[in-house]
Amino acid sequence: LHQRGCNCAQAVACTFCKEFGISEDDMFRIAEGFGLGMGVMEMCGALSGMAMIIGLDNSQGGTEEGSRTKGDTYKKIRSKVEKFKEKNGSCICRELKGVETGKVLCSCPQCIADAVALTEEYLAEQGK
């Protein structure tokens, strides 16, 4: 998907559209603003895409139910982000890309692959 013009968040989130019954076009639009570390090279877009899918899967609420699953969702996302950081040395886009140091820690395609793998790991842990 990244080679087709998707940003990192879109490439991860759109990978799981069929599992959740969401059209790729809708997910593409939802995830668009999360690329390039939300446009300022902060939190890796691939991890933002992963967080979207974990939230989509784990949330049991709606606007009427409030926040009954938020804490659990945050915990699950935090666990996967920590695993990503352990492997790649950061979760910050500009650090991963070596913008200030000249040393690339992880390429965009590898960040996407790692985030997809962590999302698949999460889904397997949930029995999916």
Model-assigned labels for residue ranges:
Residues 1-11, 19-22:
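Short, conserved "active-site rim" segments that organize catalytic pockets and cofactor/ligand binding
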Residues 68-128:
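C-terminal binding/interaction regions
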Residues 14-18, 52-59, 117-121:
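Short glycine/serine- and small hydrophobic-enriched flexible loop segments
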Residues 1-3, 33-42, 99-105:
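A short glycine/serine-rich beta->alpha loop
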Residues 13-32, 87-93:
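Acidic-glycine-rich active-site phosphate/pyrophosphate-binding loop
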Residues 19-29, 56-76:
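Phosphate-handling active-site elements
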Residues 8, 44, 93:
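Short cysteine clusters
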Residues 38-52:
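Conserved phosphate/anionic-ligand binding catalytic regions in large, soluble enzymes, centered on
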